Amino acid sequence: MAAGDWFGWMSRHFRRRRMQRFARAFGITAATRVLDIGGTPDCWELLAERPRLTLLNTPRARADLAGAAAWVAGDGRCLPFRDGAFDVVFSNSVIEHVGDRASQERFAREVARVGRGFWVQTPNRWFPVEQHLLTPFIHWMPKSWQRPIVPRINVWRWLVRVTPDRRRFYIEHYLNDVRLLDMSELRALFPRAQVIRERFLGVTKSLVALRR
């Protein structure tokens, strides 16, 4: 199996396991109203029973949302929905992308406002492999060190086939906007939520803030 194929298989494995755990946690049925912030339809194809789904994403993601039954262009920090509009708000690896601490706080407040329950997953900052770049330890370096290194040395560029423009955008976004979280920071953002761990080889790979 080629490295890129192996990476794709592993990604689908973790995604399927996460979606099944989410569905069990909330008892998802065809009647459950779910808002997926930053998502695409492919995750939901992994569930045997799909909810009443609304996808919210940026206009840039329009091509990835082809075929989605209901999607809205918007910003997770300012959601265009009334309080309690959804049974569950779902977010998979999004909160670390919204910007600085103040932006993450706005995102967290909006999630808690429009969802009666929520599931917010994010990579663990203390997992030794940076999960966007698939590169060990680089996220523990100061940003001033990362800037000259990341564009040249990262595993992601070898495993994922994208256009040069998409690659440049992704790297710049990572360097400028991505802010990884640890357990204490996620708890502070969602003080009334339970925080659970997703482990890989005994190490906490990701964190989930969960409120039923």
Question: What is each of the regions a protein language model found here?
Answer:
Residues 133-136, 159-173:
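Short, glycine-/aromatic-enriched active-site segment of Class I SAM-dependent methyltransferases
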Residues 192-202:
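Conserved S-adenosyl-L-methionine
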Residues 1-27:
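Class I SAM-dependent methyltransferase Rossmann-like catalytic core
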Residues 172-194:
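Short alpha-helix
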Residues 6-12, 169-177:
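Active-site rim elements
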Residues 178, 202-208:
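Short hydrophobic/aromatic beta-strand or adjacent loop that forms the aromatic wall/cage
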Residues 117-150:
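Conserved class I S-adenosyl-L-methionine
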Residues 25-26, 32-127, 210-211:
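Conserved SAM-binding loop
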